[in-house]
Amino acid sequence: MSVFAGKHVLIVIENLPAPFDRRVWQEATTLKENGAEVSIICPKMKGYDKSYEQLNGIDIYRHPLPIEGHGAFGYLIEYSTAIFWEAWLSCKIFLKKRFHVIHGCNPPDLIFITALFFKLFGVKYVFDHHDINPELYLAKFNKKGFFYRSMLFFERMTFRAADFSIATNESYKQIAIERGGMEADKVTVVRSGPSLKRLRITEGDPAYKKGRDFLVGYVGVIGVQEGLDLLLESVKHIVQKRDDVQFAIIGSGTALDEIKLMAEELGVKEYVDFYGRVSDEKLVSVLNTCDVCVNPDRPTEMNNLSTMNKIMEYMALRKSIVQYDLKEGRASALEASLYAKNDDTLDFAEKIMFLLDNEEESRRMADFGYDRVINKLSWDYEQVRLIDFYREVLELPEKAKVAVY
């Protein structure tokens, strides 16, 4: 008998579509593979514009999200629209087939508003803590005030509404306990372990190097706090000394146009390719071609306490890494990475060049990271934590065999 046969889990995402949100999709497919019925509510975005579709037996309901918020008014419109559609679609799904759990994924910390209504019917609320929004606000706007206090308020309300919480690392678990007031035994760490089925090592494609000897890669969001401006300054340091390195930047975000303009202004445009959001196949192909991968996240409190998916994806593809010295970045990569002095773009550039010019050391670091993922951090290990967590949420009395694929 499957572990969760007869159980229905509704997953709600506000800021990304499924299956694009890789962590959520891994969680959803793991629950489905172990017998649960799974439905997802998420926004429509480019390439994910069907109002309804079923993938791998998972029902996906997508709603319009007219704008991505900028400033107080923009965020008000975005979040109000999302809350309306989440509430409406939740009711529609509940009437079609009762769900037992709402699994809410932030940002923002507002999904509890929908969950509170269904708690009246015995539905449990699981909060999947992806981002620490007060710190995210500070990283974006660098000021405290009414909106910062609002972030803290909604975070507290989210934890109070939650029956259980999932943290992506130990730092987030401490926030759930100390700032959110949750009991320690109600918070479980489930890391965003990379899927080794998706991230397969290949020869790559030399065409991405554009005729140069080396390729340095970045994958992730392109926003203010991700430090792509710092990376471009490091690129400038490198191209002033050598012309044999190409850079590949994969991802999109609110700062993309600004970063492209900056590349032109710094005179490094011909050395940097912006690929935008790409398919998994292309992402894996580009990263497999890279000699070194980077994470230029700014040393903010948000980034210091957050585990970035890109780090473990680099490790899963056997790449050495350069990043700034942040707590959770170091906790994930350990010896797979070199750590530049925070905000020191010259030091960052020099560490990239060191790895490019010292193949043996780069390979040693890459092998360390790969072994760490294979033996400890991959989704094969994390999904067992998720299954055990959901057994507790659903009060299943006896352990059943877990499907690990």
Placement of each model-derived feature along the sequence:
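N-terminal subdomain of nucleotide-sugar transferases
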Residues: 1-48, 52-59, 238, 402-405
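Conserved donor-binding/catalytic core segment of Leloir-type glycosyltransferases
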Residues: 10, 166, 209-235, 248
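An aromatic- and histidine-rich active-site surface loop
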Residues: 47-48, 82-86, 99-135
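Membrane-proximal helix-turn-helix segments that form the acceptor-binding/catalytic region
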Residues: 91, 110-121, 146-165
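Carbohydrate-associated surface elements
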Residues: 171, 193
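Nucleotide-sugar-dependent
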Residues: 226, 281-286, 295-316, 322-332
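Nucleotide-activated donor-binding/catalytic signature segment of Leloir-type glycosyltransferases, i.e.
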Residues: 257-284
